[in-house]
Amino acid sequence: MLCLGALTSPAHAATAVTYFVSPSGSDSNPGTSADAPFRTLTKAQTAVRSIDKSTSGPITVMLAGGVYRLSKTLTFSSADSGGGTAGTVWWKAAAGQTPVVSGGVQVTGWSRTSADSSIWSAPAPSGLDTRQLYVNGVRAQRATGSLPVSVTQTATGYTTASGDPMAGWRNRSAIEFVYRGGLGLWTEPRCPVASVTGTAITMAQPCWNNSTRRVMRTDDSGRTYNLVGRKSITEAPTAVENAYELLDKPGEFYLDKTEHRFYYIPRSGQDLTTADVEAPSLDTLVATSGKASDEPSHIGFQGIQFSYANYTTSNTGTGFSEIQATYQVTGSTGYATQGLCTFVSGGTCPYGNWTKMPGALRFTYDSSIHFDHDYFVHLGAAGLDLGNGSQNDTVTACVFTDISGNGLDLGGVDIPQPGSAAQHTSGITVKDSHFYDTATEYHGGVAVDAGYIETSTIAHNQIDHVPYTAISIGWGGWPDKVRLPAQPNYSNNNTISYNLIHDHMSLLGDGGAVYTNGITGTSMSNGEKVVGNVVHDQLNTSGGHVLYTDNGATYVSILGNAVWNINVSPWGSKHVNYTAGDGTYDPTDIEGNYWPNGPSDYDNKKVLIKDNHAITGSAQVPSSIIAAGGIESQYRAILSWQPA
């Protein structure tokens, strides 16, 4: 029988319902007890949909530990919603257990390629394409090395002065060139090779054009500026990836898609005859219907690990022509038109609408979706995406790590001025969560990225050991480079407060702990608030600031933060407010911060800087500020969490 519990008064009792699921269960079971669980999440979803939520009591789907392998995306719609007497429908881990929702396939049958070789191989599922491999939960590195020959750039790629050794490599069209800093200090674009013939290297399209032919803009004084980043990659690649001939270090792998085999050199202590080797196969683990008319609401996920999602667009001719924060230029005319709106003839609108890297979990047009003590790990693109139309969602005490791109995406950049309130991303709370080792592959990614959002809070999180910016918020401010107004948008009343951020900016430049771009409100009262954050050990020396107000950042208040042990300025910088058009700066309020080498007091042209404190280290910061930064005490156990 169903797991029942009486609620409210006996005359109007609402029955609590619990369904049980286990990887060792059966979908022919009733699923109403831990002794007779369902086997699949889709069967549990069907059962939940059959309940009348208007009269039901609380509904729980209880997941036993183990791996739930998905062959297709688990999609939620209005039929899955809670509400009414049912409240929130919770999908949750059984006590003391960690269920893993996986988009991966196991790779078995490993053997040495020869008796004296360090390389092992195993068959890959036919048709599988992936950029990742995980051995006992440890991410392997695609075979990588340096470019083996000097090159000269051409319109279609490169030429070499003498014969190119890559011409003799197998599967040359699978080779990928990596350009750290190639389209700006904050970027790391990647383009595949199309062919290598003699001394000619032809690069794949449209990635090559999108990375070498970007439109420049001339302002009214005749000065030519880039809109975002550089016009073109001009240097030779800083690394070459994905060739069997580069497979030479423990922990590296290569997937030969022609012969359908993986090759791998084990790390010390790894035994491939017994190891759990996982290859991502499914791009999206969980998603919503994406329709405002079919909005899921009042659904929660608790104690679940989401892992082994795939992403292979970068393997195609599209490559990865990065703009910023893993947004990229795509399409055959992307370099000339995408997101450029009124800036160029034929430019597509709105301004700044570049292509977003998808999340392993993708939510749009939803409300009151809750993530509590969930774990986002071993993912091939972004982690969790709460996009357009996500409203009143919460992320509490979650862990984001070993993610190829951004950890958490909020909002988007494609609808700056929505036609309806349903399109707003609003009321999001991200708190007491741990982000570390994100952007492990696409190093220009950020731990938490927010585009256009409103009335949202990012508070009491810890972000550490990331290659670029920790938190990025806002978009569309770059037109001020050519003396034009920033993109109007609906962002307002967002707060970034009491976060602990350290050991960030380890690989790229021109970023910060908290980076803001574009208009954040309509006044100082409802503009962005950056309050009480504790930041130390920002690692870069090339450009950027710690609390960074970049192009068009308007109505930002930076109050009571603490910063130490840095190699760049703690705040920057003033920008002319071309939206106002009156010669003032973008309105900014900077007060009561503790930091080294901060700006002098200033009160002019709508920028106020006062009562800040020059320090040389943490000992000069009030203990109350340090104590308030980061994860609150009741949630700190997540700092010792380990993947299942």
How should each PLM-predicted stretch be described?
Residues 1-14:
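Secretory targeting and sorting signals
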Residues 17, 57-59, 66, 72, ...:
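The right-handed parallel beta-helix/beta-solenoid scaffold, focusing on the short coil/turn
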Residues 20-365, 370, 416-420:
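Extracellular polysaccharide-degrading/modifying enzymes targeting complex plant/algal/animal polysaccharides
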Residues 62, 69, 75, 90-92, ...:
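Extracellular beta-strand solenoid repeats
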Residues 72-73, 283, 310-316, 358, ...:
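Short glycine/acidic-rich loop motifs that flank beta-strands on beta-rich extracellular proteins
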Residues 141, 145-147, 308-312, 539-643:
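Extracellular beta-rich repeat passengers
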Residues 297-308, 347-349, 367-381, 390-405, ...:
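Right-handed parallel beta-helix
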Residues 390, 414, 454, 475-477, ...:
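Active-site-proximal loop/turn and secondary-structure-junction residues that shape catalytic pockets
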